[in-house]
Amino acid sequence: MDPLIQELTKEQLRDDMPDFRAGDTVRVHVRVVEGTHERIQMFEGVVIKRKGAGISATYTVRKMSSGIGVERTFPVNDPRVAKVEVLRHGRVRRAKLYYLRERHGKAARIAEKRRG
């Protein structure tokens, strides 16, 4: 890659993002602008995938809302994301957890990673 492009993208990378992977439960604080009013909206769920690297990296969070699965994809370096909190680290054996889309209730649970 061109050194000039590398330098420009390095300036735009966020360094305040916590370390999280697929299977972790996170709470994403998103800035929502409605007219002139700005507020923070939280989206809490399980990270089902991380994709890409550098400036174009994204992650997808899935949650259940009134029995309906809702997935939202966020760029890692999105300025609209105020903060990401990692609530628990899940123990999974896959990088992409697409199988959670077919599971409901207790079958969709993810075991918590043991400390040690």
From Swiss-Prot:
Keywords: Ribonucleoprotein, Ribosomal protein. InterPro entries: Ribosomal_bL19 (IPR001857), Ribosomal_bL19_CS (IPR018257), Ribosomal_bL19_sf (IPR038657), Translation_prot_SH3-like_sf (IPR008991). One of its GO terms (molecular function) is structural constituent of ribosome. This protein is located at the 30S-50S ribosomal subunit interface and may play a role in the structure and function of the aminoacyl-tRNA binding site. Belongs to the bacterial ribosomal protein bL19 family. HAMAP family: Ribosomal_bL19. This is Large ribosomal subunit protein bL19. It comes from Lactobacillus gasseri (strain ATCC 33323 / DSM 20243 / BCRC 14619 / CIP 102991 / JCM 1131 / KCTC 3163 / NCIMB 11718 / NCTC 13722 / AM63). The gene is rplS.
